[in-house]
Structure formats: C-alpha cells, structure tokens
Curated annotation (Swiss-Prot):
Name used for this protein in its record: Uncharacterized protein MJ1189
Family: To M.jannaschii MJ0233.
Transmembrane segments: 28-48, 65-85, 113-133, 135-155, 200-220, 246-266
Alphabetical list of InterPro entries matching this protein: DUF4013 (IPR025098)
Membrane topology: Multi-pass membrane protein
GO cellular component: plasma membrane
Keywords linked to the UniProt accession: Cell membrane, Membrane, Transmembrane, Transmembrane helix
Location of this chain's protein in the cell: Cell membrane
Statement: the UniProt record of this protein carries the keyword Transmembrane helix: yes
Length: 283
C-alpha cells in the first residue's frame, strides 16, 4: 500500500489535469446549483406569503404559483444535470482504477446519465439497508411511548444504532461506489469483499479527505455568510429580501462550482486506495 500522502497529492494534481474538462464540470454543477437555489427561494417565498402576506409585497398567489411551476421544470433539469455529474464521478473512479491519470472525457452523455441514475439508486438502497433497523427501533419507541420506560429505551437504542449505522454507511459507501464503477450495480452490495478492504489507513484517509472537503466548502461559504450577517440582515425590513436572494444564488453557484472539484478530489483519492487494496488482497 502507498502512503496516504500519495493519494492526497495525486488526487489534487488530478483535479487540475485538464482545465477544460474541469471547467465543463464546474459550470454544469453551477447551473444545477443555481436552479436548485432559485427553486428553493421561490418555494420559500410562496410559504412565507401564505403565512404572512405582508412579508412579500407586490406578489399574489397566481404569480408565485406560476413561478413555482416554471422553477419545478428547472428543478427537473437540475436533477438531470445532477445525474450526469454523478455519472461523471463514476467514470472518474472507473478510469482511476484503470490507471488513467487525467480527467475523463464528457462524451456519451446518455451513458453518464444512466450510470449517474443507478449511482443515485444504489446509494438510496444502501442508506435503507444501513438505516432500517435503527429507524424501526425509533418508530417502535414512539408507538410504545405510553409505556414510558420501554418507549424511551427503544428510542434511545434507536438513536444509538442510528449513529453507529451512519458511521458504518459513510465508511462503506466510498468503496462501494468505486466497486460499482468497476463491476456494475451489483458492486454496491458485495458486502464481504468491501468490508475486507476496510482498514485503519482507509478510515484515516476518509477522515482527512472529509476534513479537506468541509474546510474548502466552509471557506467558500464564509464570505457570503458574513455578508448576510453584517451587511444584509441589519438592513432588512421584511422576511423576504431581494439582496439576500441574490447573495444566496451567487453563493449556490460558486459553492457548486467548487463542489465539483472537491467531489472529483474525493472520488479520485478513494479510488486510488481501492485499486491498491484490491491488488494487495490478491497477493
């Protein structure tokens, strides 16, 4: 096995290996982020208007509903773009295992869409598998709340299992995603093989990658958070602020653009570990 620094350095340089392909991904991600932000803002305005019409001046329900319908179509477009991006991440992982050292092409969009959709479905199924037991414990606890001690015990055990299952899912799904990129949909569920690949080095790598991604995203978001707190919020006279809306959209665009690069970085680092670990286990 190579040192963890190798995976991190390689993943960093890999992200910058083809500027044009990276920009394409960043712009697609930004488009999806902008549409999603606008949809969320319109939905929020509609809810605020229904609760307190005085907070949204000059708009009636017809205008808001029309805007929501248009935004919903936009949301579907954003969802499709999201599947394409997920398909590209799958291609990044697959080509990494195949020893390619540059960002893959954006060709065969239909294939990216298909692989991205299956990637999404696979992750949902994994979430259900890992979360079903703790959720059932919590539900039983709620139904047994009339028996205070029994209900509280079930709920407590449920939340404890939920915490453990969440950690287990986060550890498992990184390698499962790479396995899917190599072997197809069934690769998500090769539990024995994937758990064999997990060791302390992998967990440390996962933590480091996670911290790097979180820090980068926080640094990108921080100027917009400070702007909203110190410049926009004190000047607001209503719940809805056009200035804050513009800041939210710009923040979503920039965060999504950077998010594409951090996602590629993370997928590359984990795929490199997967490749080396598979070779090591074969010996």
């Amino acid at each position: 096995m190579k040192k963890l620094e190798y995976y991190l350095k390689d993943a960093f340089y890999y992200v910058l290996s083809d500027v044009k392909k990276g920009i394409v991904g960043g712009l697609l991600s930004s488009t999806s982020g902008a549409i999603g932000a606008i949809f969320g803002i319109i939905l929020s305005i509609l809810l605020i208007h229904n609760i307190n019409p005085n907070d949204v001046v000059g708009l009636d329900n017809n205008i808001l509903l029309t805007s929501l319908i248009v935004a919903s179509f936009g949301f579907l477009i954003a969802l499709i773009i999201g599947f394409i991006l997920d398909g590209y991440y799958v291609r990044v992982m697959k080509t990494t295992v195949e020893n390619y050292d540059v960002l893959p092409d954006w060709d065969d969009i239909a294939e990216l869409l298909k692989r991205g959709f299956l990637y999404w479905i696979g992750n949902i199924i994994l979430s259900i598998i890992f979360m079903i037991v703790p959720i059932l414990f919590i539900i039983f606890g709620v139904f047994l709340i009339f028996l205070p001690l029994v209900g509280i015990v079930f709920i407590g055990i449920g939340f404890l299992l939920l915490f453990v299952s969440t950690i287990a899912l986060l550890i498992y799904e990184g390698l499962a995603e790479v396995n899917y990129s190599v072997k197809g949909f069934s690769g998500f569920f090769e539990f024995k093989e994937i758990f064999r690949m997990i060791n302390l080095n992998y967990i440390i790598l996962l933590i480091i990658v996670g911290v790097i991604v979180i820090v980068i995203n926080f640094v990108v978001q921080l100027p917009f958070i400070l702007l909203k707190i110190f410049a926009i919020s004190p000047a607001r006279y209503s719940t809805f602020s056009s200035s804050e809306t513009i800041v939210d959209v710009i923040s979503a665009v920039i965060s999504a653009f950077v998010g594409f690069y951090t996602a590629v970085f993370a997928k590359r680092a984990i795929a490199l570990y997967y490749k080396d670990r598979v070779e090591e286990l074969k010996k």
